[in-house]
């Protein structure tokens, strides 16, 4: 197979995760250019992938103004900056890997899917959960008829109290206007899993949820704007930024603060940047818990719960069928099949393949990249998370958010 060349647009945390595939499999993928507004990120990528300075750009516009210089574009910008570079890259002839969500606009999602079809290019959306051994095992059991006809599904997404504070209170995805609603940004993964496991079109959605806790009303008396401003609650507050970001851990989430991982560099970032703010005094507006109920074309029903208020960060799934049930916990990487005609359940303990150790989402990041590279190598063969497939889950998310706000059932 030929080596695929790629440009990286957006060199933040997600962009660097996907680009890592080129480090570990240089015979398959090579990063040849980068675009990012932050100079330190550009320098890091150039150093890591031996990219000349002339191939580093301050913006995607400057990069894509050049003639096509690679086979593919990895587009990992923030949510509200997905559509324009994706359409421009497709127009230039690039195959595209696009971080989810496709867009924070329903019409733009449809436009992206249509553009990919017209351009006859691979456009893979980063619905990484489809690629995990965990969910692939569940899908295989369902397709093999082990539990008969699927009747219902329920999934819980435990975001984790500190993860929610990091990403959705202080971080890039805290504000639905600047980013996306929580159901779209975080939980389009889960809607995609429902669609994939059901194999049917969703026809009806209802949803409830709100921002309950991370707001000014819950700020302790006398708490300052920043954790670094002498907060009297530092010792007792689980969200104290100094405890979270000034420990010995310099990986995620600490590496989101700055590229300077010295204690002084991190403290400076907390004093000046968004991650040092009090969690009760931010400009966040996304929900901190939400439930969604769905009905599919074949009558299958599904329920989903997302909550910030957990100690663990994992998904749990239950699939009930006419001949048995599947219960699964991503935290323990265990899938349990209990057929009604068998006295004892079958316990499937999944191992994490060693090649996925440097990736997230239960190995999904690694297998997504492998699938994308192979699709490009094969000149555009269909992949597991194409834009046309991913569009369905995005439409469910937009409907769920309308239902939550308008307090009514939405027909799709």
Regions found by a protein language model. Give the residues of each.
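N-terminal Rossmann-like dinucleotide-binding module
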Residues: 1-51
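Hydrophobic residues in well-ordered beta-strands that form the structural core
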Residues: 98, 104, 123-125, 328
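C-terminal helical cap and adjacent loop that interface with cofactors, partners, or active-site loops
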Residues: 49, 286-412
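Rossmann-fold dehydrogenase core element
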Residues: 111-128, 148-152
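Predominantly a Rossmann-like dinucleotide-binding segment in NAD(P)-dependent oxidoreductases
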Residues: 129-277, 407
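Catalytic cores of eukaryotic secretory-pathway lumenal/extracellular enzymes that build
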Residues: 13, 83, 108-110, 130-132, ...
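Beta-loop-alpha module in the N-terminal Rossmann-like domain of NAD(P)-dependent dehydrogenases
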Residues: 12, 51-115
